[in-house]
A protein has these predicted regions:
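Glycosyltransferase-associated regions of secretory-pathway enzymes
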Residues: 1-63, 78-283
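Small-residue hinge/turn detector
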Residues: 63-75
Length: 283
């Protein structure tokens, strides 16, 4: 099983938090190969795109890359800022189960899948369908949707997205997302994709649309082992909510999931990189 990751300027130039995360993946998974790609690798792998891939922000290019890699090779995708707390073999089979696919997810009522950590067996039907959908979406370069500009999006959609960004998480977010689902998915709809703008979470929305329209894709996701994506953000959430006192919450936060998503721009204290006892970590 290959473990894929990406840092645009190369692993050797990555910031300290990224270096620590990547090294931890190697240390914990000696039976598996960690492949860290850079901008040149990406350009080669995505050379069949119908436009210069470098016209897109690096985050969008990385979104395309991860699905392409998993379609071609199978394996696991891990964001470079994803801190592992357990060896992959401890939970990979549990997570992929009979579907051969796993992504952390939001509430099943709207099936918003995260893409910061993905596992897919070679030839997995969901990944194949998603890669096909991505190719169909990126027929031309688009500009990242910026709330400060007036895009070709209908004004109502602009207000909807702004409201979403102020809702936060929890029940308010869930109610809002359920009510405005069609509007949020507008950019990847047949009409919305004719424009020249795309939202930051375009790939997550495209996965949701795929689940809505492709019975086979939906069956895979509904049979997938369910783990809520919020469990992977407990360390970051603690830092945002508790400020300097968050360090006291770190031991508990680290036990919530086999992986924790970090922000590479933050100077994380050493407590964040301390390993809890394996048996205490939720799988």
């Amino acid at each position: 099983l290959d473990i894929f990751s990406f840092w645009d300027s190369g692993r050797q130039n990555a910031p300290a938090a990224v270096q620590t995360c990547l090294s931890r993946w190697e240390e914990m998974n000696p039976e598996h190969r960690l492949v860290v790609l850079d901008a040149r690798d990406m350009a080669d792998l995505l050379s069949d795109m119908p436009f210069d891939i470098n016209l897109l922000p690096v985050q969008a290019r990385s979104d395309i890359l991860r699905v392409r890699l998993l379609r071609q090779h199978g394996g696991a995708w891990v964001d470079a800022t994803l801190l592992p707390l357990l060896p992959l073999d401890r939970y990979a089979d549990v997570y992929t189960g009979k579907t051969g696919f796993f992504a952390f997810a939001g509430p099943p009522s709207h099936w918003r899948l995260g893409n910061f950590f993905l596992i897919a067996h070679a030839g997995n039907a969901f990944i194949r369908a998603l890669d096909d959908a991505i190719r169909a979406y990126w027929t031309h370069p688009r500009q990242l949707y910026d709330l400060r500009i007036q895009p070709t999006w209908p004004p109502g959609k602009k207000l909807t997205i702004r409201a979403l960004l102020t809702k936060g998480m929890g029940k308010g977010y869930l109610d809002f997302f359920t009510r405005w689902r069609a509007d949020l998915l507008y950019p990847v709809s047949p009409l919305g994709r004719q424009g020249d703008y795309f939202p930051y979470f375009w790939e997550q929305y495209l996965m949701m649309q795929l689940i809505d329209t492709d019975p086979k894709a939906r069956a895979i996701v509904e049979a997938m082992t369910y783990r809520h994506h919020d469990l992977c953000h407990m360390v970051q959430n603690a830092r945002e909510h508790f400020g300097p006192d968050f360090v006291r919450t770190v031991p508990m936060a680290l036990r919530c999931s086999p992986v924790q998503k970090l922000d590479w721009r933050v100077d994380w204290p050493p407590e964040v990189f301390a390993l809890p006892a394996e048996e205490s970590i939720l799988i």
